[in-house]
Amino acid sequence: MLSIHDPLLIFTDLDGTLLNSHTFEWQPAAPWLTRLHESGVPVILCSSKTAAEMLQLQTTLNLQGLPLIAENGAVIQLDVHWEDHPNYPRLIAGISHNEIRLVLHKLREKEQFKFTTFDDVDDQVISEWTGLNRAQSALTRLHEASVSLIWRDSDERMAQFVARLNDLGLQFVHGARFWHVLDASAGKDQAANWLIEAYRQQWRARPLTLGLGDGPNDAPLLDVMDYAVVVKGLNREGVHLRNDDPQRVYRSQNEGPDGWREGMDYFFSRS
């Protein structure tokens, strides 16, 4: 159904998809990453992580120079060859990290919502939360257009909190382990569509798209893909897509990078 020689873009989530959620291992996906790189197929990382974290991961995965989608779509790192773009090197959706911090501070002071943001703690605490080393934990704090937090209040209070955020033009997104507050105009799907259009103009043909993700917050991204791999994950809610046609969507039996490889094998062995 898909060919490595098609005009093709691969969009992939990180934690629980390309990376093992616990060990951060990615090696099972290495043969496919090498093959895609050698064929000139862009692999676009898409995550709640900061751009600083993801740029480091790009180097590890030999994907440096390609675009990436950070902070759940609030930040797009542009391709290194797009220097002439007016927003190079990064496109930011909506208000900044510091503006969101101020909103959250006021909400917490006024309405006593209980949560702990990454800005409230030091690198050591984040290291304990994430399992990352201190240097990597420091990169997780470099948000540009969102705030990550741990929710410590009731479900009822969360509903009130979400309503307040929505009134202020913000959204509350549940990631693999943390919650994220970002501008309502941002999203993995909007960021992916922006990049698809950028490549369409560059290639003078609309690229085929394949997305891979494991969590409910990946559904908007997978919904705008031509083909999708739902990698088996830990989230009990599962991933519900608008179009779950088995011709378009494959659900893996394996988790993490093993499931990532399984999904790639499935779509590229059917042609």
Swiss-Prot record:
Gene3D superfamilies: HAD superfamily/HAD-like (3.40.50.1000), Putative mannosyl-3-phosphoglycerate phosphatase, domain 2 (3.30.980.20). InterPro entries: HAD-like_sf, HAD-SF-IIB-MPGP, HAD-SF_hydro_IIB, HAD_sf, MPG_Pase. SUPFAM superfamilies: HAD-like. It is found in: Cytoplasm. The keyword Metal-binding applies. Its EC number is 3.1.3.70. Its cofactor is Mg(2+). Mg(2+) binds at residues 13, 15, 214. GO terms for cellular component: cytosol. GO terms for molecular function: magnesium ion binding; mannosyl-3-phosphoglycerate phosphatase activity. Its main location: cytoplasm. Keywords: Cytoplasm, Hydrolase, Magnesium, Metal-binding. The active site is at residue 13. One of its GO terms (biological process) is mannosylglycerate biosynthetic process. It catalyses: 2-O-(alpha-D-mannosyl)-3-phosphoglycerate + H2O = (2R)-2-O-(alpha-D-mannosyl)-glycerate + phosphate. It comes from the Bacteria. Belongs to the HAD-like hydrolase superfamily. MPGP family. This is Mannosyl-3-phosphoglycerate phosphatase. The lineage of its organism: Bacteria, Pseudomonadati, Pseudomonadota, Gammaproteobacteria, Enterobacterales. The gene is yedP.
